[in-house]
Structures are given as structure tokens and as C-alpha cells.
């Protein structure tokens, strides 16, 4: 049996953090998920040209950052220059793509 009906089996997971409230896959979005008492977060991982693992849903940058192109074509230092909050709202300008540490 894979599932028994019990409240103990229910987990609430933030998809890319709390992407409806804050820029997805940013540290502030992950922290808000923790603050709200969520049981976990779901994110995606990509590798940069210098072998760093970064947290970002898309394999390209256009939708959520001020950059363009594929993550795999950037070094971590180059990605850190991009703004991962500005497209969500100017209020969140300056958010960065986080690295998996």
C-alpha cells in the first residue's frame, strides 16, 4: 500500500518557493515558504559552464531575468550579474539566481 488516508501523509510544498507571492526560485521566495510553514520546496537545478549548480526552473533566462540565452552557456559569475526579481516586480529588483550549496 502506497498511501493511507491520514493528515500525517499530506505535505505542502512550495513550487519554486512561493512563486505567486515572490520571484520564483529566489532565496526570498524559499525563505517565505519556510516562514509560511511549508514542508518543502520544489525547484530545478542547472549546471553552469564552470560546473556550478544553480536553482532555476527554465533552461533559458528570458522569462524570469534580465538575461537571455541558456543557463548552460553562462558561468556562475556571469549569472550572478543578472536580475532574477525585476520581471516579477520592480520592488524585487536585485534578486539573484541562487547556487545550490
Spell out what each predicted region is.
Residues 3, 57-101:
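Metal-dependent phosphodiesterase/phospholipase catalytic core, i.e.
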Residues 14-24, 88-95:
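Active-site mouth loops of central-metabolism enzymes
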Residues 15, 33, 44, 79:
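Conserved, mostly hydrophobic/aromatic
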Residues 22-32, 100-101:
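Short, acidic/polar
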Residues 1-16:
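N-terminal amphipathic alpha-helix/helix-capping segment at the start of soluble metabolic enzymes
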Residues 13, 41-42, 55:
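Conserved beta-strand positions in the central sheet of alpha/beta enzyme cores
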Amino acid at each position: 500500500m502506497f498511501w493511507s488516508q491520514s493528515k500525517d501523509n499530506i505535505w505542502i510544498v512550495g513550487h519554486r518557493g512561493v512563486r505567486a507571492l515572490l520571484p520564483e526560485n529566489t532565496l526570498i521566495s524559499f525563505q517565505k515558504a519556510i516562514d509560511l510553514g511549508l514542508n518543502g520546496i520544489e525547484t530545478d537545478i542547472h549546471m553552469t559552464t564552470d560546473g556550478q549548480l544553480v536553482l532555476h526552473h527554465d533552461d533559458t533566462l528570458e522569462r524570469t531575468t534580465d538575461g537571455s540565452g541558456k543557463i548552460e552557456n553562462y558561468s556562475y559569475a556571469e549569472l550572478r550579474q543578472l536580475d532574477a526579481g525585476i520581471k516579477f516586480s520592480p520592488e524585487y529588483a536585485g534578486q539573484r539566481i541562487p547556487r545550490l550549496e
